[in-house]
Amino acid sequence: MIQIVFDSKTGNVQRFVDKTPFRNKRKVSTEEYLDEPFVLITYTTGFGEVPKTTEMFLEKNAHLLLGVAASGNRVWGDNFAKSAEKISKQYQVPILGKFELSGTAKDVELFTQEVERVVTKSSAKMDPVKQ
């Protein structure tokens, strides 16, 4: 089962993660090296920036990153959930969702569908029999 790794400052991302059906969840650790693929959910800080803790985690683990989602607040306009865009561009992974604060039931549903899609696609790439 896919790992969901998350970074939460105010608890919004934690609440979003708690609403997902995924069981293998862990909070970002700047010291941790992972050994299996994961999906990242983070928040956006400042003026559309990626949190430092997320950056430090990705320095060690980005090679296993399958996709990213981010929270934000729509009052920030173009900077809404901008961290997802920055991580997607830097690490060439898909954006699996953007949600406001702790997200809605629809946000969770769409994120879950995107995770399942990216995991299926990733599994097919790793299994030459499926190609």
UniProtKB/Swiss-Prot annotation:
GO terms for molecular function: FMN binding. Gene3D superfamilies: 3.40.50.360. SUPFAM superfamilies: Flavoproteins. GO terms for biological process: protein modification process. HAMAP family: NrdI. Probably involved in ribonucleotide reductase function. Belongs to the NrdI family. This is Protein NrdI. It comes from Bacillus licheniformis (strain ATCC 14580 / DSM 13 / JCM 2505 / CCUG 7422 / NBRC 12200 / NCIMB 9375 / NCTC 10341 / NRRL NRS-1264 / Gibson 46).
